[in-house]
């Protein structure tokens, strides 16, 4: 009897386990099917909404850019300045910018303890000096180089270093409108109490110390900028992210107390998150370094080493252009692409008849040794249609995402449009803009 009961129990247990297993498999299939449907649905939405950010691991990202049937329904996102245009140059370069970093390398916090900026890789500092000498866009002699996680961190470090530490009131930070849209947000982000955003430099009239951010060429409108306030007690920070030959004529080496640069817009490697500052005053440099030390305990060595290699290749391409290694320099290639993009944009604006763009006077470029026009990284577009007050919303209705003028301290008739996206995205934008009629 006991044997029968034990056998019955075993059979019953086995039946229950099989039932549970089958139920689990069934539920898993339903969940997988539902998840797959959700992913497919989400992928379609993402594909429609973010044309500028395809997955780099997907076959479509590696394949040549072609117009798909869905292209006309896609939203062209040119709100941001993601410099993927430069992939056209770097892909054919092959292994020229490839570096190998062994697992034991870059383990220490310290890069060069003999350098004021102790976390800066010596090779990166060397290539910074070299690229400025090759291009002729900045004086490096008598300057301390400070590396940062992009020029954004360096701007915050500069504000920290230049703000009085013993004042009962925060120092005012200004920039002439239209100013870079992130300046107000960055200045007031942590509400530090040592500095505050005070708006448009053109209307700043307080008789007190101030910091003026001078962006030249300017983001968003592309014009060459000079200080606006020009009063006693003023401190200047020059943001020169776009002072490179593909965007503007290089007229003279920048000789400022504090200048900011970044690889994001110079070479297109925004993902490296690397920038640098050229600082004349050693005490200001020390305080900037202290900020970065407190903020991130230095800057990624791996990114610095890769950035150094990229800058080295750019300099090599300039010095060896026309040879067997480099048929043309990086800046010649980039300038040609920007020239064509601006030509297409001006033609599209003319055909539409609803918009206008800034006009730039040609100037002599020492790098190209020629008189050239300005072709900024962003287009500052104005909607001239009488019944359209919000150009950003108007273009959104035509599936074009831009950044409206209110973010830059001016009216909503203006928008900023990135000129640096991939060719497929840019061509779709031009096609769509050309078709807008009154």
Predicted regions and their residues:
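PLP-dependent class I/II
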Residues: 2-438
């Amino acid at each position: 009897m006991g044997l029968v009961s034990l056998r019955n129990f075993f059979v019953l247990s086995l039946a229950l386990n099989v039932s549970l297993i089958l139920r689990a498999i069934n539920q898993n299939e339903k969940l997988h099917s539902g998840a797959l449907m959700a992913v497919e649905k989400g992928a379609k939405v993402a594909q429609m909404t973010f044309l500028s950010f395809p997955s780099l691991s997907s076959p479509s990202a590696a394949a040549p850019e072609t117009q798909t049937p869905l292209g006309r329904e896609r939203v062209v996102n040119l709100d941001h300045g993601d410099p993927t245009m430069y992939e056209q140059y770097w892909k054919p370069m092959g292994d020229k910018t490839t570096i190998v970093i062994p697992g034991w390398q870059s383990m220490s916090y310290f890069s060069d303890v003999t350098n004021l900026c102790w976390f800066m890789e010596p090779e990166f500092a060397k290539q910074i000096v070299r690229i400025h000498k090759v291009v002729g866009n900045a004086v490096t002699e008598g300057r301390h180089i400070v590396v940062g996680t992009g020029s954004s961190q360096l701007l915050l470090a500069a504000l920290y270093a230049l703000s009085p530490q013993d004042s009962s009131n925060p120092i005012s930070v200004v920039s002439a409108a239209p100013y870079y849209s992130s300046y107000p947000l960055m200045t007031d982000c942590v509400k530090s109490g040592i500095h505050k955003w005070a708006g448009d430099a053109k209307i700043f009239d307080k008789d007190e110390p101030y910091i003026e951010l001078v962006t030249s060429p300017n983001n968003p409108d592309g014009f060459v900028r000079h200080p606006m306030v020009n009063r006693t007690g003023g401190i200047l920070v020059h943001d020169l992210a776009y002072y490179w030959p593909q965007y503007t004529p290089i007229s003279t080496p920048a000789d400022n107390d504090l200048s900011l640069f970044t690889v994001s817009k110079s070479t297109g490697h925004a993902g490296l998150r690397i920038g640098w500052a050229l600082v004349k005053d050693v005490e200001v440099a020390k305080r900037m370094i202290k900020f970065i030390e407190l903020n991130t305990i230095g800057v990624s060595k791996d990114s610095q080493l890769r950035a150094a290699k990229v800058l080295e290749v750019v300099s090599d391409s300039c010095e060896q252009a026309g040879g067997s290694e480099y048929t043309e320099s990086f800046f010649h290639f980039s300038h040609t692409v920007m020239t064509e993009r601006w030509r297409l944009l001006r033609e599209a604006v003319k055909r539409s008849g609803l918009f206008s763009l800034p006009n730039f006077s040609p100037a002599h470029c020492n790098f190209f040794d020629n008189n050239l026009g300005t072709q900024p990284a962003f287009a500052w577009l104005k909607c001239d249609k009488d019944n359209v007050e919000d150009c950003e919303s108007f273009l959104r209705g035509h599936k074009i995402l831009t950044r409206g003028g209110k973010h830059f301290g001016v009216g909503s008739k203006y928008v900023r449009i990135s000129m640096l996206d991939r060719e497929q995205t840019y061509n779709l934008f031009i096609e769509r803009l050309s078709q807008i009629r009154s």
